[in-house]
Amino acid sequence: MTDGDHQIPNKKKDAFKNFVDDAGIAKYDKAAEGDKYSKYVLTDFGRKICELGGYDSTAWALILCNLAYTPAYNWFINNLQLGVCYSPDSIKDMLGYVMENDIKGLGRRNILSALKIVLSQTPLGKERIFAEFNAEEKKEKITLKSMERCTWENPVPEVILFSLYKFAENCGDYYQ
């Protein structure tokens, strides 16, 4: 994993590295050559995602199956009810109960900012796989107005099977 010409700040590379790791797309390989970023190599799952393509709704639904078991996405899934419209401020307030040490609110802001980007730039929001969102876009700035968790209207059977596999895996390898 490299930005090619070293123009991306390390903070953004760290965030991306964490995302691809959480999503199961790439894993750290200490035997690989290069710096801490280029030591991340594609997993079998990551290769499948690349085959499907970065804008493919099935790819993003599969990624969501992995992300559902990370603390941030798991919180959204368990705390934002389906069909209820939430403002950014209401989500920040809800996050405040689980992020008590986030006195300045920077952590809550960062979580909401990341969610806003994922919803506005991927099929998870654009094709209503995870949520419907209302945002205002001006130049490169996106302002989230509201979001509502929704059900996926046309789920792909392979994604459902993968989600069941992930569920079994996260229940202590209960596959029967």
Residue ranges and their predicted role:
Residues M1-Q176:
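Donor-sugar nucleotide-binding helix/loop cap in glycosyltransferases
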